[in-house]
Every structure is written in structure tokens, then in C-alpha cells.
Amino acid sequence: MANRGGCVTVAAEEMDELRRRNIELSREVAEMKTEMIKLWQRTVVAEEAEEQLCSQLAELEVESLEQARDYHDRMLFLMDQISRLSSSSVVSSS
């Protein structure tokens, strides 16, 4: 009978250890859930920031393209003016 009592004691100790471990694991799971929620929230913020930056970049690309076209048009205009002035000065010199 002593052995049975010993088995019962061991089983009770094992149960207590399993309960403690279960509580510990439950706490760890709760902490991990909290951390996961924080990471998810940061991910959402980062995605929103990325979208905003992409939008701003697209606007800047459009603006720079417009400026490049304006610059190109201005260069063509000035080259035409120089060409006209050069040809008119040649005609005037003759």
C-alpha cells in the first residue's frame, strides 16, 4: 500500500507541476498575442506610410516629367531663336 500512496503522491506532484507549467504557458501565449497585436499594428502603420510615400513619389515623378518637358520645350524655343537671329544677322551682313 505504501507504493500506491507513493504513486498517488508522485501523480499529485506531477499534476501540480503540469498545472504550473500550463499557467506559465498560458501567460507566455498571452504575452505573445499582445506582442503579435503590437507588431500587426506597427505593420499597418508601416503599410499606410508606404502607400503615402508611393503616392508622393508618383506626384514628384509627374512633376519632374512636366518640368523636363517644359525645359526641353524652352531649349527648343531658345535654339530656334538663336538660329533665327544667326540667319538674320547673316542676311543683314550680306
From Swiss-Prot:
Q: Which residues form a coiled coil?
A: 8-35
Q: Which terms under GO biological process does the entry name?
A: cellular oxidant detoxification; cellular response to sulfur starvation; response to salt stress
Note the InterPro entries from the entry.
LSU
UniProt keywords (A-Z) are:
Coiled coil
> Which lineage do the record's taxonomy fields give for this organism?
Eukaryota, Viridiplantae, Streptophyta, Embryophyta, Tracheophyta
Q: Which PANTHER family match?
A: PROTEIN RESPONSE TO LOW SULFUR 1
Name-wise, this protein is: Protein RESPONSE TO LOW SULFUR 1
Query: What is the top-level taxon of the source organism?
Result: Eukaryota
Q: What induces it?
A: By stressful environmental conditions such as salt stress, AgNO(3), and sulfur deficiency.
